[in-house]
């Protein structure tokens, strides 16, 4: 007897005959295939819509690369269809909505991030998200408000998918039909994949082709988003991060700066360290990345020493990386100090800031003379990776070796971007607004207050000094909510500009006032005539729109090159006449130029930048690897060569040689960073070139949480729960809280006479690790018998933490007064809160000890919420640095 072929659809109606059921199965099966086709169309259109919408929202128009985001959007849609086709009914609908929601959410995040920072966020920086929310929450809300319509447009496909999938009445499919639909989805995906691969492969030989963009590990996130879109970029970054281990290490040489065979150079004529033998170094290592770098540098040509070598060897040096600085607001009337600095000394007429956004990239390049790692394999910012590397050429370390004091300052929190680690490693005694500088933290903070709080550290020391400043007053947003813009509003009220441009100028006036104060103090100390001041920007002021920036500049600037034109101010008093330099240069060239001017022994082959005052090759390099020379400009985005004038002819061979040279600068920088190359060259013990070496505890993942924990741990104030685990998520206990305060106090002698009766027992006695701390706490009345929490094992909430912190501050002689009007209002609004607790929470909020960029109402609402060990550590870290001034 033959077995009948079963239907792909479960049939449950037993009132119909077998013939009727068989007839019904066919149209029902067709209907289910129609549903599959609709799903395929829905997911593919969603992928295309999200890609095109994001592209248009960010770039403003379509270009010749827009077709590839469309194709990858189709691929993403086919992949979604493949995933949901293999799932049962309910799970199929839930998964479909989830996949689209994830796609839309990523696009929304990138849109807002681009609005705030001017570029796209790499997957490797997703861990910074929490820090952005905490430290940039007002900017985050501003970005959302500015892009609300675009955000709603990006939400449309999610709404459509929810309506089409979640509200659609699905039918159960037998495994056989699910398998067929899965195979059909796979076939569509494969066809699209072959099509896209074929199209990319056709143009693979072009240096900046879509194929190279997609496959090259060193492709930047911005370039990738523009050429291949969000989905493909995210997929590639995830693939390299999760499965690829390391990126490219080979450096392709250019004929412009390489000799055919290794040569020996004399330090009398060249900026080299003669003891370095790159060939011998290559033979001494088994590391592929070290060997590749050694072999490349063995043929590299160094820069020549020149008439300016050692010109400033008797000078002090102050370097300033100025937040969002540009030269267009400088005038003799409005900014006389900046005007004087920019017109006296060495004048660089063709300087370009390399970066569109991200302070840490510009700051890193200025300080290191190297480009940051912008490849897909990076897992952290380059500054953080360099935080454990050997860095002999950073100005702090280099000048300290010549007898200079070296100080570093920033007028925001010190653990942001881990500056308390990275800048100390560059040789600076580092202070920030929350760690060592007596100044107010604001958004943004005052450059003038930073200067006032720091100058006395070095100006009257009688020793040569180098001071480095990372400013903050020029940070966006440019409106009257900006603290520095509001402060200086009257000074710009009559200027003929729009409000954002006025606000930009107003907040940058704080830098002018800081420099005015600095010059005054230098004069008073009698060292003004022997102090060189260098200033440049970290990045383009992305907080201004293109039209607003043109308004400020008084001209229409092209967005590929001229918007990056900026200032490398090198103020040198005492020269008989200004030195005018017309060579093209950019951020990475500042360090080698200063090393040469100050007569530092360095090897120019070990830096990506070039001494601008030397003879030879000079290029202004931008972050997307576009560049400018005297003869021509190269637009990497469009892959076009633009001659300097109509009489200049640029051969393809010459353009390619320059392109390879620029590419080699980035690859060399990445190799030096990721291998701790200087440690290899100078036979120092290598740290491995990873921030992981500085992370003591595996459960403290965020680089922005590490600083407070490591600070408190290294000071001996807190103990981890295990050698490699801090235990930050565990609930804080009263005994440990007072023990940390006891350690901060210096572990004074104490006894048990103040302990409440019956407090000691079998579990808590003189052998207990918190015994002395609890005895001390009761003896000093830090703990009191009528407190809500008195037992050493009690869990600590926000209210208790605030009370203990304020009590300790009073013991330490800190002014803990609060506004009485605000206190009375608080007691009326929160009648259940005791007077002491109200004072404590109000004071802790005002001093930003327990809250950061959040309101008092939020703190009060959390009064009874228990805090974690990490929160305890963070609060007490801010007590130490904000109020007790215990240096970092």
Regions found by a protein language model. Name each.
Residues 104, 131, 589, 593-597, ...:
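Generic recognition of well-ordered alpha-helical segments
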Residues 342-346, 371-372, 400-404, 459-460, ...:
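Sec-exported extracytoplasmic/periplasmic mature domains
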């Amino acid at each position: 007897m033959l077995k009948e072929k079963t239907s792909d659809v479960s049939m449950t109606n037993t009132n119909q005959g077998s013939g009727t059921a068989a007839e019904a199965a066919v149209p029902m099966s067709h209907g289910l295939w129609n549903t599959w086709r609709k799903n395929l169309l829905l997911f593919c259109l969603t992928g295309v819509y999200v890609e095109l919408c994001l592209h248009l929202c960010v770039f403003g128009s379509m270009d010749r690369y827009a077709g590839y985001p469309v194709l990858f959007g189709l691929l993403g849609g086919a992949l979604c269809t493949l995933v949901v086709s293999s799932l049962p009914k309910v799970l199929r609908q839930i998964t479909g909505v989830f996949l689209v929601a994830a796609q839309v959410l990523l696009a929304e995040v990138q849109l807002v991030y681009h609005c705030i920072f001017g570029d796209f966020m790499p997957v490797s920086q997703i861990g910074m998200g929490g820090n952005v929310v905490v430290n940039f929450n007002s900017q985050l809300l501003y970005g959302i408000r500015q892009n609300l319509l675009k955000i709603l447009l990006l939400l449309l496909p999610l709404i459509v998918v929810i309506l089409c999938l979640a509200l659609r009445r699905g039918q159960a499919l037998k495994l056989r039909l699910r398998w067929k639909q899965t195979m059909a989805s796979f076939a569509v995906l494969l066809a699209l994949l072959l099509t896209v691969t074929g199209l990319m492969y056709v143009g693979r030989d072009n240096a900046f082709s879509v194929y190279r963009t997609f496959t090259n590990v060193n492709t930047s996130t911005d370039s990738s988003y523009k050429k291949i879109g969000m989905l493909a970029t995210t997929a590639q970054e995830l693939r390299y991060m999760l499965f690829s281990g390391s990126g490219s290490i080979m450096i392709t040489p250019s004929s412009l700066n390489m000799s055919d065979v290794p040569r020996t150079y004399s330090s009398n004529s060249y900026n080299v360290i003669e003891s370095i033998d790159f060939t011998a170094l290559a033979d001494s290592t088994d590391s592929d990345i070290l060997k590749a770098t050694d072999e490349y540098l063995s043929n590299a040509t160094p820069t020549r020493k020149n008439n300016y070598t050692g010109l400033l060897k008797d000078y002090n040096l102050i370097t300033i990386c100025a937040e969002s600085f540009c030269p267009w607001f400088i005038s003799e009337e409005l900014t006389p100090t900046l005007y004087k600095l920019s017109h006296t000394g060495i004048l660089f007429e063709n300087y370009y800031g390399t970066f569109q956004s991200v302070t840490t990239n510009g700051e890193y390049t200025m300080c290191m003379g190297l480009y940051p790692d912008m490849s897909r394999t990076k897992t952290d910012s380059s500054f953080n990776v360099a935080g454990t590397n050997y860095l002999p050429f950073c100005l702090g370390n280099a000048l300290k070796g010549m007898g200079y004091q070296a100080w570093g300052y920033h007028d925001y929190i010190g653990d942001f971007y881990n500056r308390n680690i990275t800048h100390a490693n560059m040789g600076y005694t580092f202070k920030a607004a929350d760690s060592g500088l007596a100044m107010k933290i604001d958004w943004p903070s005052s450059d003038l207050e930073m200067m006032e709080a720091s100058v006395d550290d070095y100006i009257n020391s009688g020793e040569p000094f180098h001071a480095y400043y990372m400013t903050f007053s020029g940070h966006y947003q440019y409106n009257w909510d900006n603290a520095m813009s509001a402060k200086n509003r009257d000074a710009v009220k009559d200027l003929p500009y729009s409000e954002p441009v006025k606000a930009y100028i107003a907040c940058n006036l704080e830098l002018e006032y800081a420099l005015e104060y600095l010059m005054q103090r230098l004069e008073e100390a009698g060292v003004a005539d022997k102090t060189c001041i260098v200033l440049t920007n970290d990045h383009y002021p992305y907080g201004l729109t293109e039209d607003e920036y043109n308004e400020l500049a008084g001209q229409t600037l092209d967005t590929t090159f001229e918007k990056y034109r900026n200032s490398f101010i090198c103020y040198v008093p005492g020269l008989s006449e200004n030195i005018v330099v017309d060579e093209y240069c950019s951020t990475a060239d500042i360090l080698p130029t200063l090393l040469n001017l100050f007569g530092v022994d360095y090897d120019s082959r070990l830096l990506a930048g070039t001494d601008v005052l030397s003879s030879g090759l000079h290029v202004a390099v931008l972050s997307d690897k576009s560049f400018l020379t005297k003869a021509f400009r190269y637009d990497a985005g469009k892959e076009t060569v633009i001659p300097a004038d109509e009489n200049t002819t640029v051969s393809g061979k010459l353009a390619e040689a320059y392109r390879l040279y620029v590419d080699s600068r980035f690859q060399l920088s990445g190799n030096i960073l990721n291998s701790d190359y200087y440690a290899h060259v100078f036979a120092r013990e290598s740290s491995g070139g990873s921030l992981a070496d500085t992370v003591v505890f595996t459960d403290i993942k965020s680089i922005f949480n590490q600083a407070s924990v490591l600070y408190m741990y290294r000071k001996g104030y807190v103990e981890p729960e295990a050698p490699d685990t801090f235990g930050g998520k565990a609930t804080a206990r009263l005994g440990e809280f007072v023990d940390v305060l006891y350690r901060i106090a210096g572990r004074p002698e104490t006894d048990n006479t103040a302990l409440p009766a019956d407090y000691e027992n079998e579990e808590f006695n003189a052998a207990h690790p918190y015994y002395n701390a609890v005895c001390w706490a009761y003896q000093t009345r830090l703990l009191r018998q009528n407190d809500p929490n008195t037992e050493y094992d009690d869990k600590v909430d926000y209210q208790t933490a605030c009370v203990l912190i304020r009590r300790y501050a009073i013991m330490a002689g800190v002014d803990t007064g609060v506004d009485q009007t605000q206190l009375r209002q608080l007691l009326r609004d929160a009648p259940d809160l005791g007077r002491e607790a109200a004072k404590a929470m109000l004071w802790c909020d005002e001093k930003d000890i327990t809250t950061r960029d959040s309101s008092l109402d939020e703190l009060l609402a959390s009064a009874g919420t228990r805090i974690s060990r990490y929160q305890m550590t963070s609060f007490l870290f801010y007590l130490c640095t904000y109020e007790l001034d215990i240096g970092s």
